[in-house]
Amino acid sequence: MNVVFAVKQYISKMIEDSGPGMKVLLMDKETTGIVSMVYTQSEILQKEVYLFERIDSQNREIMKHLKAICFLRPTKENVEYLIQELRRPKYSIYFIYFSNVISKSDVKSLAEADEQEVVAEVQEFYGDYIAVNPHLFSLNILGCCQGRNWDPAQLSRTTQGLTALLLSLKKCPMIRYQLSSEAAKRLGECVKQVISKEYELFEFRRTEVPPLLLILDRCDDAITPLLNQWTYQAMVHELLGINNNRIDLSRVPGISKDLREVVLSAENDEFYANNMYLNFAEIGSNIKNLMEDFQKKRPKEQQKLESIADMKAFVENYPQFKKMSGTVSKHVTVVGELSRLVSERNLLEVSEVEQELACQNDHSSALQNVKRLLQNPKVTEFDAVRLVMLYALHYERHSSNSLPGLIVDLRSKGVAEKYRKLVSAVVEYGGKRVRGSDLFSPKDAVAITKQFLKGLKGVENVYTQHQPFLHETLDHLIKGRLKENLYPYLGPSTLRDRPQDIIVFIIGGATYEEALTVYNLNRTTPGVRIVLGGTTIHNTKSFLEEVLASGLHSRSRESSQATSRSANRR
């Protein structure tokens, strides 16, 4: 179950099926992103694709010597653009691939528009999602719900993305969902409807143990997306932001022109592939090794190219050297900027207190540490409010809850009202009343013993103590212990055996910390394959945008009186 490989295969097949000759790849905004995640432009150029165009671009030239490969989402707009294109074709022949199921009526409309008979084929290739890592996919949807319910357009897009994912991996799963989330049940029903309607597409070879789709809701764990991160990929997303593998470095002080935007892709960058799940300290020493290796391989200025053999060796090595030079400068810049931000924002200290809020249960120590950091001028308003949110979520119903006082401290620190208001919005979004699970206190004896032993041994790294709630959920699922009264099956049948192929989807967005959890479970659990997906991949900033978009904040009030009243009521 490798989503990058699945999408890559589709694109390779499109290009191969169009035969030899020069080609143009005609895409829409979304499929452009889907393709760019798995192929670089130079890789596609090697396959005789010399031009990349958008179907909605008005000023494309007529180029009858090119074949057109169209890879488009089956939307009304795209079908209309194609109809216009086929009435006045700009290319010699058209190979049309839709990223999802296309209606018969749309195919009929296209056939009627194709008066010049330029269409060679129309097919469905189910690459209708963003393949981020081999075990991680996203739909790039921010703000999928209105209150607790789906935005209808986003429900439709998510259903399409999830069913395409299942088709691309050739899985017809049983479905379980988080009972506490109406949105999870609704999505499960929509996926099930598509499977029933398009049953012929889902007729795959039966496996002994059917695959399982588990649908979860971000509301059940609002802690994970609020934490600072210390592994490479997650940290880059948290501090710099990753958008379809691209990182905007234009705000970095003294940045050179060619490094204003860089691409981090494990497919084309060996250093990144080997380091994306390692912690920041290891990255530092690995980058030093990369630099030293680069110094050794670097062509020396005084190097004499005396013989033809010398020159040949230099020319052969130069592309590799050039690539290595680009890799070195890119990672040195990224790691340098992460380092600068950690120091400037005092993130080591901030993160230690975040971890205490997420993992420990000592209220007075936590409160003292949060108050101390709120007084620290190096701590930004963003980090200050994140600490107060973590406190508010953890100690929401604590008898000595001091949230009103912390809100006053935020105001004294000069934190903007828009941030202060978000504290109650986050509690409204993912507080105790909403959660189907208990995030903070292990209930069973085994979990309590584990936590006690963990406390005795001490934690190897205070900055990475936290494990997402997803870890516990998947651990129980793999061992056949996930409670059916909390995660029921959709429909009458249940799974007798432990699942082997698991697709987990998080409504409201997944995180790179959860992707790391899935990566580690895949690595350490023989016979189990897990793929994680989400409506988007969050960092703290985008998660707070998700909370705002849900509209729940409009019901919550910032005043400390309201906060304390609700604390008493609960």
UniProtKB/Swiss-Prot annotation:
Disulphides: none
Signal peptide feature range: none
Topology with respect to the bilayer: Peripheral membrane protein
Keyword DNA-binding assigned: no
GO biological process terms held by the UniProt record: protein transport; vesicle-mediated transport
Source species, domain of life: Eukaryota
InterPro entries reported in the protein's UniProt record: Sec-1-like_dom1, Sec-1-like_dom3a, Sec1-like, Sec1-like_dom2, Sec1-like_sf
One GO location term (cellular component): synaptic vesicle
Subcellular location: Golgi apparatus membrane; Endosome membrane
Keywords annotated in UniProt: Endosome, Golgi apparatus, Membrane, Phosphoprotein, Protein transport, Transport
PANTHER family in the cross-refs: VESICLE PROTEIN SORTING-ASSOCIATED
Subunit structure: Interacts with ZFYVE20. Interacts with STX6.
Family, as annotated: Belongs to the STXBP/unc-18/SEC1 family.
Protein name: Vacuolar protein sorting-associated protein 45
Lineage, uppermost ranks: Eukaryota, Metazoa, Chordata, Craniata, Vertebrata
